[in-house]
């Protein structure tokens, strides 16, 4: 009888321990799910900010392109005016043959973004492991929830990986666009300075 009582006590203790571990494991999966959902929300906000920044860069580069077009017209007018005034100085052609001009405008992409962020894909079906994510012990609703939580965590982690790749691609694209904008801005400034000098010289000669 004493041995039976001891065995029952031991079994009850094992059951209590199993229940305790199941409760702790369930809470752990809930915390994991909350953390990855917060990370996903932060990732989405970051992608939205990058997209808005990309639109701003597009507008800036379009402005640089418009200045370039306007300067072509202004340089042509100055050249015609210079011929009329008997001046042969035409630094605009020399400027257009310079390395800086070719670098800024030679391969003008007109602000076209080379790559767009890929669509975030839910990978839960791909990541789900046949038979579930956990080894069953208590075989109750807690383990069902644990399995569901881990499946969601796995899917969100897959999404986060795609988000990270999208962010990296978008940042690389924007960095290249910023370099183009800087080159175009420098080229436009040089051309505006040259045009001002020519106009001043022609006015002075008049």
UniProtKB/Swiss-Prot annotation:
Where found, per UniProt?
Cytoplasm, Perinuclear region; Cell membrane; Synapse, Synaptosome; Photoreceptor inner segment
PANTHER family linked to this entry = SYNAPTOSOMAL ASSOCIATED PROTEIN, SYNAPTOSOMAL-ASSOCIATED PROTEIN 25
Which cysteines pair up through disulfides? They are none
Q: Please identify the protein, giving its name as recorded.
A: Synaptosomal-associated protein 25
Q: Which domain of life is it from?
A: Eukaryota
Q: Which residues carry this modification: Phosphothreonine?
A: 138
* Function text: t-SNARE involved in the molecular regulation of neurotransmitter release. May play an important role in the synaptic function of specific neuronal systems. Associates with proteins involved in vesicle docking and membrane fusion. Regulates plasma membrane recycling through its interaction with CENPF. Modulates the gating characteristics of the delayed rectifier voltage-dependent potassium channel KCNB1 in pancreatic beta cells.
Q: List the GO molecular function terms.
A: calcium-dependent protein binding; lipid binding; myosin binding; protein domain specific binding; SNAP receptor activity; SNARE binding; syntaxin-1 binding; transmembrane transporter binding
Can you summarize the PTM annotation of this record?
Palmitoylated. Cys-85 appears to be the main site, and palmitoylation is required for membrane association.
Region: Interaction with CENPF; residue ranges are: 1-75
Question: Which positions anchor the lipid (S-palmitoyl cysteine)?
Answer: 85, 88, 90, 92
Q: Where is this region: Disordered?
A: 1-23
Membrane topology (UniProt)? Lipid-anchor
């Amino acid at each position: 009888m004493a041995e039976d009582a001891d065995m029952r006590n031991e079994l009850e203790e094992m059951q209590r321990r199993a229940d305790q571990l199941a409760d702790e494991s369930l809470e752990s999966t809930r915390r994991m799910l909350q953390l990855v959902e917060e990370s996903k929300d932060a990732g989405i906000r970051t992608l939205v900010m990058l997209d808005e920044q990309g639109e701003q860069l597009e507008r800036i580069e379009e402005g640089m392109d418009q200045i370039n077009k306007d300067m072509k017209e202004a340089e042509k007018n100055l050249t015609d005016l210079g011929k009329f005034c008997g001046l042969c100085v035409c630094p605009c052609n020399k400027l257009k043959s310079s390395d800086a001009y070719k670098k800024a405008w030679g391969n003008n992409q007109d602000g076209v973004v080379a790559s767009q962020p890929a669509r975030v894909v839910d990978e839960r079906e791909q990541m789900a492991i046949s038979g579930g994510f956990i080894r069953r012990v208590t075989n109750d609703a807690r383990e069902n929830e644990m399995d569901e939580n881990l499946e969601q965590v796995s899917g969100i982690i897959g999404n986060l990986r795609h988000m990270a790749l999208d962010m990296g691609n978008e940042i690389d694209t924007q960095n290249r666009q910023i370099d183009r904008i800087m080159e175009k801005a420098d080229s436009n400034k040089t051309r505006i300075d040259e045009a001002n000098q020519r106009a001043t010289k022609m006015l002075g000669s008049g």
